[in-house]
Amino acid sequence: MAVAANKRSVMNLYSHADDMYSHQTRIALAEKGVGVDIHLVDMDNLPDDLFELNPYGTIPTLIDRDLALYEAKIIIEYLDERFPHPPLMPVYPVSRGRSRLMMHRIEQDWYSLAKIILSGPADAASKARTELRESLLSIAPILNEAPYFMSEDFSLVDCYLAPLLWRLPVFGIELDGQGSKELKTYMLRLFERESFQASLTETERELRFGNPV
């Protein structure tokens, strides 16, 4: 799989076909129009050269010439600084700080619930599913304020949210009731972006097959 392989300098990304963190990096790369060769790896059979580049053998791992980066947050912020246009973070320090805090909260509050839903005991998964659904619906007022999450422009915060929202059918979460209209509108806006569509693996496309927003 390759994203925009004819643009700018070609990088290499070790990615999983269905992983929220890998998905974040693929969205950011597509937004930047960066040439990248994407290597989809089997987590049960990691390539030896990955450990030569990343001592932890974790996914995603980005290679840019002699630089190897791992951890999605580090990778996407590096990409935003390495390729300034289009910017995916606010210009002003206070706004940048708020964006970083929001990304941290999304990971701590929502990604953690997603992990429980996917791999936790049945009772814990059911509780996490309810908590995640209610928490997502509660942000509806924020989504009424701007086209993207607390911003007029697509940002790294949206890169964090999009992979999570795309997987709601997998989590067994249906959106209805108060706040669902606003959230669904926001989701469609994200999912219809050219960069988001370019970021999807075949595995990820199948996640929503027959599961419209």
Where are the language model's segments positioned?
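Feature targets compositionally biased, intrinsically disordered low-complexity regions
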Residues: M1, D176-Q178, F209
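GST-like domain detector, emphasizing the conserved glutathione-binding G-site
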Residues: M1-P141, P147
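Short, solvent-exposed turn/loop segments enriched in Gly/Ser/Thr/Pro and often Arg
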Residues: H16, L156, T203
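Residue-level detector of family-conserved "landmark" positions at structurally sensitive sites
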Residues: H39, A72, Q178, L200-T201
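A generic membrane alpha-helix/interface feature
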Residues: F51, P60, A125, V170-F171, ...
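Conserved residues at the C-terminal ends of beta-strands
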Residues: R65, A162, E202
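GST-like fold's C-terminal all-alpha helical module
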Residues: I106-S199
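Acidic/histidine-enriched, glycine/proline-rich intrinsically disordered or flexible terminal extensions
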Residues: E202-V213
